[in-house]
């Protein structure tokens, strides 16, 4: 038995300089697991609640000492002595202790930190790498990365309404080569921007954040960077967008301030379809407001056979909402953010539900990240096939890519890189 003998919660800082929760779990054998949780900027209204102190004179109200206190008192008392290898039972204990639908009492940030730290401690005691602990012998597929090389929206202080413009390397034989491709395109884009006298400062997720005149101009510039780096757009590298449409939906209209447009759901569907016809876009995330299910239906009917339509704010890693979406034929993919739901068991359930329905599951970071690389192990362990973890800069993003390199090396000859086949929802 891997008995839990000590639990320590603490307040640390994330990549934006805001407080977040870290937890250490110590087992009877002396092994320890440590985990830190991320935090989002554009958040879905139905996400599990991260507990903040609200004390205006300290970290602008964003402190997490209440969540840390819950770990060091109530949660510690409830799980002390439990078997760390019994993840589902431990997460069930946390859920029952919280007693709310949205984890608002203990805080999803407190619960997730404990859930992750327990899994890491159990993997360490079992002598297994975390991805293998999660997935067993069947875990051998590396994920295709969606690399956010231009930031807009809530992730940057610029004129772009769309939040993320991403490159997706698909023709490479290995993850290592895909990562190299992404890095080379990133540096080619930096040179192009610099030559134009445009900003090469980066946003929250490590992508550039210049003031482009339009989304078209941004996408065209990325195509130039792909070519400049020696790759073929549409063959070696595809494009992906995260619209984060809930952020610019006001008074029943999609208000693209940077383009001077106010569009209905049908008009915004046409707008996205035009972009998908003009550019090699394989994936669009949050193309409609999280509550605009009629708009989502229109978008899915229009583009669902040729473009991956990812629900982030729409589904918030919640099986109840995902089930409804599947039944109604809304979207064809779910974004998986561990802190949206608050425990590993619930996270894994959402991934499996998506797969059974023929939806893809894209494992994702948050804009406020830490050096914790658990999502890399989840992507491989659960054979998710896709990961979103930022650009090719900032160590809070690179830590996940480097962990995937280590995993690929550890797997050796049995490692596989799916490329275009990761988009099985488009077959």
UniProtKB/Swiss-Prot annotation:
Broadest EC class assigned to this enzyme: lyase
Subcellular location(s) per record: Cytoplasm; Secreted; Cell surface
UniProt-listed Gene3D superfamilies: Enolase-like C-terminal domain, Enolase-like, N-terminal domain
Predominant location: cytoplasm
BP term (GO), one: glycolytic process
List of residues binding (2R)-2-phosphoglycerate: 163, 337, 366-367, 388
Annotated GO CC locations: cell surface; extracellular region; phosphopyruvate hydratase complex
Molecular-function annotations in GO: magnesium ion binding; phosphopyruvate hydratase activity
Necessary cofactors: Mg(2+)
Keyword hit for Lyase: yes
Record: active site: 205 (proton donor), 337 (proton acceptor)
CDD domains, sorted: enolase
Protein name: Enolase
Organism encoding this protein: Burkholderia ambifaria (strain MC40-6)
Lineage: Bacteria, Pseudomonadati, Pseudomonadota, Betaproteobacteria, Burkholderiales
Record gene name: eno
